[in-house]
Amino acid sequence: MSLKPVKLAFEKYSATVAKHPPVLIFHGLLGSKRNWRSLAKKFSCKLDRDIYAIDQRCHGDSPCVAPLSYSAMALDAFQFMKDHKLDKASIIGHSMGAKTAMVTALKWPDKVEKLVVVDNSPWYQDLPRDYGAYFRKMIQIDEANITKYSEADKMMSTVEKDILVRSFLLSNLKKDSNNSNTFKFRVPIELISKSLKTIEGFPASLNDLVYDSPTLVIRALKAPFIPDSALPVFKKFFPKYELVSLDCGHWVHFEKPKEFSESIINFLNN
């Protein structure tokens, strides 16, 4: 099956004077461009670069089109640069977006000035068991025709006690276009849940490729996504990588926003 790119929704944060190539930001699984608003504004000021916070396919306001694979999402990223006449950009990717960013850099290295990989590795990586429970519960919520956000929150609280994580997951709820009294998820829950094995993986076709430009890897020490055993794999694909480890969980940009943003600003300004 030949892949076709989709037009990605985005929010642009313009620098007062853009002195350097722009930055593309790719969110994680079930995230969206909205999760990055405050950091994107900060980056545009501190980096003198235009910042594009982007919704990946099947997320946010971008089209819901199969397949949800890294080859497809990287092609979307490449097409986005083409459509917006961006000769070169730096890319920041978190979680699923980190793999999209890595695949894009490996396939089109001349298009990527610098790469920032946030808490994911270039290999097969099991998602925590919580994700299966999240998706099963989200399907139940979608089918329940709920009329209040609080009802969805109550249902989700049976599988996730942390209110911040629940609020992140439920940020995908919106009023149903066919019935404004009920809420539905804006993302295709069934398609994404069927694509989890692909999302856990990394394309084997890239095994002989190298991205030989500066790469920053930000690791969350309280998450399982970048174990020490992954570091030689980073060295193979990204020989110029440097590692920053932060004492937090997987949602690094929420838990350690100051340290996270300073690491990226220093790296991109260097």
From Swiss-Prot:
EC assignment: 3.1.-.-
Span of domain AB hydrolase-1: 21-257
Record's GO cellular component terms: mitochondrion
Enzyme class: hydrolase
Record bears the keyword Hydrolase: yes
Pfam families reported in the protein's UniProt record: Abhydrolase_1
GO biological process: fatty acid metabolic process; lipid metabolic process
Sorted UniProt keywords: Hydrolase, Mitochondrion
Highest taxon of the lineage: Eukaryota
Protein name as it appears in the record: Abhydrolase domain-containing protein C22H12.03
